[in-house]
Every structure is written in structure tokens, then in C-alpha cells.
Amino acid sequence: KYSKKYNYKYAILRYFNVAGPLQDYNRTIPPVFAGFILRIKGNHNPIVFGDYMKARDYIDVSDVNAFHILCMENEDTANQTFNLGTGKMTNLMDLKNMIAEIMDVKVDFDHYDAIAGEALNSYGDISKAKSMGWEPKKDITDTIKETIVYLENEIKEGNIDPFTFMEDLEIEKIGA
């Protein structure tokens, strides 16, 4: 109603799991890419809550940015809702294995109870976004590599210590 009354154009964008450099790794539960990478850098196993076969649709932040620009430049996106993801799921086991292979290490998981209410699988139907001429371009392995480089620089600059990363995590308050 507001958009019609004031001739205001909008686009609603539903992000799935945005990944890549500059993620806020200081959150209570850090983004999975940063969490896994920093735990490995600190000689710890990545932490997983619940089923390590749960899967998510990970999209690179640069692909999300590209769709933002498309929305600003293309009138056909006005007053519509779009899912932004890749349309592909990657489970935590595969993600851990990809990261470990790129980092040339062998790691297991530190496993904790599931987080209450967390979905087992989540991915987006991106067909509507694709109908606007947009396609996600970044492969998950490229996103992992760029995130590793970013986090290595954060470590080098003294912004984070991978050996103490997540040591204050209160597991019992997170799990079910």
C-alpha cells in the first residue's frame, strides 16, 4: 500500500547463507566459513551443533552485491521478492572437507547438541532471480579461498587470535 500511495519502488531480497571475506567472525556463533577456518588455524577441530549432514545454500557476497546493483538498474525488479542463493546445498561434512583440503590439513569435528529450532536443510529457489538475467558466479571453493586469505590477513594484523578464538563460547547456552 505504501509503495502505491507514494509511488515508491522496492525489492525484497531474501538471502540464504551469505559467505565470503569481511564476515563478522565475532558473533556469538560465527559464520560457518570463518568459524571452521579460524578453529583450524588455531589447531582445533571445527565445532558443529547437531547433525553434520545438515546442509545450507551458501552464496558469495559478491553475487549478492551483483543482484543489488541489478535491482537498482532494472525496473523489472520493482515491487518484487527474490531469493538469493545458489540453489545448491552443501552439507557441513562436505564444507569441512573442502576447507581442510584447501588448507591441506586433516580435521574432525567437535560435536555438540543441536541448536533448538535449527532447520536441517535450507536452500533457495532462485528461479525468479535468474529470470532477471542474474546468475550466481562464484564457486564455493573460490569463496572459501578468499575467506581464508582474508582471515589470514586478520590474524597477521593482530585482529584475531585463532588459538583463543571461540574459547569463551558457552556451549551449554547454545545447544538444545
Task: Write out the residue ranges for each language-model feature.
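C-terminal substrate-binding subdomain of Rossmann-fold SDR/epimerase-dehydratase oxidoreductases
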Residues: 41-176
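Active-site "substrate specificity/gating" loop of NAD(P)-dependent dehydrogenases
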Residues: 24, 28, 51
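Conserved sequence/active-site signature of Rossmann-fold short-chain dehydrogenase/reductase
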Residues: 11, 18-20, 64
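Active-site Tyr-X1-5-Lys
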Residues: 1-11, 16, 37-42
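Short beta-loop-alpha junction of Rossmann-like oxidoreductase domains
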Residues: 21-23, 128
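Active-site loop/turn elements of alpha/beta-hydrolase fold enzymes
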Residues: 15-18, 51
